[in-house]
Amino acid sequence: MTVSLIISTYNWPRALYLCLDSVMQQTAMPTEILIADDGSGISTRDVVRHFEAVSPVPIRHIWHEDKGFRLAMIRNKAIAASRCEYIIQIDGDLILQRH
């Protein structure tokens, strides 16, 4: 079974950092992590790059230009980019309980 974890985010790099840090603490990891970014700036990109370097699973940054609130569109792009059988979607301001 393969699983994509899709994390939606927009211009809150500190929250995304904490969210990804909680993902890294899990004992059961997804096959891949997709960051569905609704047009965030460089600080968010830097957080994603940091975790790309330390993650035991691939992380891909799915981004589009900020043209207003287009969360559904960026989530759909991330779903289309998934390479897995199953998808779990969470928001980038969640901290996962350790499992």
Positions of PLM-derived features:
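Short aromatic/hydrophobic "clamp" motif used to bind/position activated sugar donors
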Residues: 87
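Acidic donor-binding segment of Leloir-type glycosyltransferases
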Residues: 24-63
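Short beta-strand/turn micro-motifs composed of small residues
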Residues: 7-9, 37
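Short, well-formed alpha-helical segments that are part of the catalytic scaffolds
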Residues: 12-25
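Cell-envelope/extracellular polymer assembly enzymes that use nucleotide-activated donors
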Residues: 2-4, 32
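Active-site acidic Asp-centered loop
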Residues: 38, 90-92
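Glycine-rich, basic loop-to-helix element that forms the pyrophosphate-binding segment
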Residues: 65-82
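Acidic donor-binding/catalytic loop of UDP-sugar-dependent glycosyltransferases
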Residues: 43, 94-99
